[in-house]
Structure formats: C-alpha cells, structure tokens
Amino acid sequence: MGLSDDEWNHVLGIWAKVEPDLSAHGQEVIIRLFQLHPETQERFAKFKNLTTIDALKSSEEVKKHGTTVLTALGRILKQKNNHEQELKPLAESHATKHKIPVKYLEFICEIIVKVIAEKHPSDFGADSQAAMKKALELFRNDMASKYKEFGFQG
C-alpha cells in the first residue's frame, strides 16, 4: 500500500504550498473538525467554552493547535513512510494520554484534503488528491497499528 515516488512527489509538492501558512490551514482544519464532528471538540477542555464559529476563529489556542497538528503531519509526510521516529511519540500520546479514537484521525484526514482542495484548487488536482488521500490513509493505518502496541483499541 506504499506510495510510488511519483505519488510522494505529488504529496510533497502540495505540502510545500501548505507549509508557508500552516496556521491558517491548521485553524481551518480544526474549526471544520469541530463543526462537522462536535464530539471531537469535547476531547479538548480548553476548547469546550468556544461555542460559536466566531469564538473558534478568534481563538489563538485553536490556531496554535492547528499549527501543531499540521507541523507534526508535515514532519511525518516528509519521511515518505519511513516515519517510525516521528510517528511513535505521536501515537503514544494520542493513545495513552489523549485517547483519540482512530475514527477522529479519519475525520481530520478527510478535512485536511478538503481544506487543501479549497485553498489550492489549481495545484491540487485529481492525482495530487489521490496521492494525499493514500498518504493520509497510510498515516492512519500506522497510527492504528501503534495504538494497538500501546494497548489502545481506539
């Protein structure tokens, strides 16, 4: 299920467009996640009181968390599936401390693809979208596998 060199080139090519503005991309991803899947917001004590879109948009903590999420994902993507060193601590914290279900990873990965498509329509064609979806599926599967190693069925 690995990606070809061409697919990785598509993934990293679009990621190079995302990286200069991780905070805006990340903020949009987190806000959309909370809008579409309100149960995910309940996992974050610091975001529970942000009950409106305006409150989410004006929250520096939401922007900061979105940046953190996309920064970590970018480091993993750049490893081109040789991401054990980056993935293991992320999986451990999400499995043992935060208890984030794999389903939530699926939600956020779908939203990441949608946000990139909206922000970069001319650079994120069908081949790039397919490659990114495949890379994110690989990420999710590897996270799920690590979760099991840490005793979390998520």
Swiss-Prot record:
Binding-site residues for O2, renumbered to this chain: H65
Record-level GO cellular component terms: extracellular exosome; sarcoplasm
EC number, as in UniProt: 1.7.-.-, 1.11.1.-
Name of encoding gene: MB
Subcellular location: Cytoplasm, Sarcoplasm
Globin domain: residues covered: 2-148
Chain's role: Monomeric heme protein which primary function is to store oxygen and facilitate its diffusion within muscle tissues. Reversibly binds oxygen through a pentacoordinated heme iron and enables its timely and efficient release as needed during periods of heightened demand. Depending on the oxidative conditions of tissues and cells, and in addition to its ability to bind oxygen, it also has a nitrite reductase activity whereby it regulates the production of bioactive nitric oxide.
Coiled coil: none
Residues engaged in binding nitrite: H65
Name of this protein: Myoglobin
Gene Ontology terms describing biological process: removal of superoxide radicals
Annotated organism of origin: Caretta caretta
GO MF annotations, alphabetized: heme binding; metal ion binding; nitrite reductase activity; oxygen binding; oxygen carrier activity; peroxidase activity
Family: Belongs to the globin family.
Pfam families per record: Globin
Enzyme's top EC category: oxidoreductase
Keyword annotations from UniProtKB, A to Z: Cytoplasm, Heme, Iron, Metal-binding, Muscle protein, Oxidoreductase, Oxygen transport, Transport
CDD domains found in the cross-reference section: Mb
